[in-house]
Swiss-Prot record:
Lineage, broadest ranks: Eukaryota, Metazoa, Chordata, Craniata, Vertebrata
Topology term for the membrane: Single-pass membrane protein
InterPro entries hit by this protein: SIM_Modulators (IPR053081), SMIM5/18/22 (IPR031671)
Name of the protein in question: Small integral membrane protein 18
Pfam families xref list: SMIM5_18_22 (PF15831)
């Protein structure tokens, strides 16, 4: 008799706890989804700007430079340009 009472008690406790548990659904609320999308767009914008700034410095295409000739631009010191010139000047060994 005591074991059946204990089983009934545990069953009722489980049922009571089952009603108290709330399932959590990510992005169930539209505001959460909107904030997440805005955050992703912000991160994408920042990363894109960093990549563009890096490429602008590395490539140094001089598209915006005025009143300079190609000869003037080539004569300016540029570590990347000198490295590329050194690579081009190396003799390749044909095997």
């Amino acid at each position: 008799m005591a074991s059946s009472h204990w089983n009934e008690t545990t069953t009722s406790v489980y049922q009571y706890l089952g009603f108290q548990v709330q399932k959590i659904y990510p992005f169930h609320d539209n505001w959460n989804t909107a904030c997440f999308v805005i955050l992703l767009l912000f991160i994408f914008t920042v990363v894109s700007l960093v990549v563009l700034a890096f490429l602008y410095e590395v490539l140094d295409c001089c598209c915006c430079v005025k009143n300079k000739t190609v000869k003037d631009l080539k004569s300016e010191p540029n570590p990347l340009r000198s490295m590329m010139d050194n690579i081009r000047k190396r003799e390749t060994e044909v095997v």
